[in-house]
Amino acid sequence: VVNQVATDKFIQDLERVAQVRSKIAVCLQKLSDTINQAELAGDTSSGKLSLERDLEDISVASKNLKKGVFRLLVLGDMKRGKSTFLNALIGENLLPSDVNPCTAVLTVLRYGAEKKVTIHFNDGKSPQTLDFQSFKYKYTIDPAEAKKLEQEKKQAFPDVDYAVVEYPLTLLEKGIEIVDSPGLNDTEARNELSLGYVNNCHAILFVMRASQPCTLGERRYLENYIKGRGLSVFFLINAWDQVKESLIDPDDVDELKASEDRLRQVFKANLTEYCYVDGQNIYDERVFELSSIQALRRRLKDSQADLTGTGFPEFMGSLNTFLTRERAIAELRQARTLARQAVNHTREAIGRRLPLLDQDVDELKKRIDSVEPEFTKLNHIRDQFQKEIFTTRDTQARKVSESFRSYVLNLGNTFETDFLRYQPELNLLDFLSNGKREAFNTALQKAFEQYITDKFAAWTLTAEKDINVAFKELSRSAFQYGASYSQVTDQITEKLTGQKVTVNPTTTTEDDKSPSWAKWAMGLLSLSRGNLAGVALAGAGFDWKNILLNYFTVVGIGGIITAVTGVFLGPIGFALLGLGVGFLQADQARKELVKTAKKELVKYLPQVAHEQSQTVYDAVKECFDAYEREVSKRINDDITARKSELDNLLKQKETREINREGELKRFKSLQEDVIAQLQNIEAAYSNLLAYYG
């Protein structure tokens, strides 16, 4: 039964979510079509209601839901058994895992009726389609070559952006997309696409190995790219079955227990801090001991095999809960909010239109003129909010770039203690023998790059926290401005119709009276257009992190490293040569190396601080500018729509006789149709919630 709960239940629950997604997407599309047809009919009757913004928003949401997938990013160092794990997860020997080859390109695994691989290039070449065998042959390399490339700072396939593998697998068909990233070393980790996926996936599956618990490379990656960034990570400790094999006496139960407990302590000590959600420790729902090879062998013999004892049932149960309950519900809730909003806007517009049908042209003009002061107030609210965004932008850009500047200038102060953990094993004789000098220089350069990368990552985390706080403040302001804005729009309605607007006091935040631009600005709605490998994620709120990411990966750290390393190695070499053969003690040489490195570093820090702090300033500024552009556009759209809704009616009245009865009937049926679509969406959403109990 446990196994049924794992694989089959996961597939069933995914299927259920896919059906609800598809149903809601269809309802949103119908809602959009209904409103659109009514708008077209308005041209020959009392004029359009100007609902363009709602039409655009719900059709984007519908498209996003139609394409909706759960994206899982698989991360892990070389030789952690990632491919074996993935093959076990999907139940087929799909990815190359024999004799340790490494997939050397970022691979996106998604559903396709035909098996095929498409390679996407980054140099303008057209994508290339391959069959499976050719892909395995052409784009995998053995670990020795991978290590060599890493040391030389080279990529195996520098012209390849990513590969898309399409495959007719049930798990993929039900809406799972798997992104397999090549490795954790810095060149790959800093790759914009990999980092982009880290920030744009539903969950990260971080594969480790029981026999190599929490290596320095893994700890550095987690510290630099995962820590404190609000990401959902599942840690999969692979090859747990090998713990037993590594014992002197594999049958000694006590020794096995002691060995496993020691390992668990190491993992717990290193991973617990990544398993807190809203202050709650959920380690047991995030860390799993797996035997992927056992699970794979069983599933290849029988896709329905019992996987008890491999760790897979527990892991899949937890992943299932996370994706089909937490994540799916959040995504569908947004769609429901948009639908409610579109229906409310339609009903409000009808409510304003009906009383005005009875007025003649002069009376209508008089009423339109009477609300001019209110429109001025709306513009004023927009300007106030815009001003606040700009003030926040300037303060943050200045503050964050200053913090970068002083951070860089202060690196020298703690360099000697900080650099210790990175320093290569130092054998001075190696350095003096020409044959090994090259290798020594390479090791030193790598150590220095790691040091800079880690320092930069630590700084970006504090910068992100500051920016996040600033956006939270703006979100609160958006709520306030939104409330004032709604009061004014209510006054407009009252003046136009001569009827009081009733306010429902018992609404939740999602359905409060906030205008839709304010909901967007508060981060309740996210309508991303899709950037990475053509798919957007329905995350919540405005995605400023991707903007920062683009700036920081492009400049960032690569720029700093190049600026400093080249000039850096020469003087260190001279300093070491100057010690002469009399000073062969490693300790003395080590001190000398750090001293010279510091001296050289300090020379270049002011230049780096000066050049790069401008980039940091621009990056932060662009985050707030992008936010302001969208907010202002949405407010302007709303003001324009409110005006044109009135102008449309006036124009129709001036040019034709409006059939009042016909309009009453048309609006009544429009209102019934949109409410019916909304009820379908509400029902689909509630049924899913009820099913999860």
Please provide the spans of the model-predicted regions.
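C-terminal helical "lid" subdomain and adjoining coupling/linker elements of P-loop NTPases
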Residues: 298-307, 322-363, 377, 381-388, ...
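Intracellular, membrane-proximal regulatory regions of polytopic membrane proteins
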Residues: 253-254, 288, 297-301, 397-398, ...
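Globular "head" domains of long coiled-coil molecular machines
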Residues: 36, 59, 63-329, 566-578, ...
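Core structural elements
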Residues: 50, 284-295, 341-348
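A non-catalytic, extended alpha-helical scaffold characteristic of dynamin-superfamily P-loop GTPases
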Residues: 369-624
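Alpha-helical heptad-repeat coiled-coil segments that mediate oligomerization/polymerization in large
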Residues: 350-371, 375-378, 382-385, 389, ...
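C-terminal modules of long, charged coiled-coil scaffolds in eukaryotic assembly complexes
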Residues: 511-539, 543-544, 548-553, 645-693
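N-terminal low-complexity/disordered regulatory or targeting extensions
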Residues: 1-79, 92-164, 228, 455-497, ...
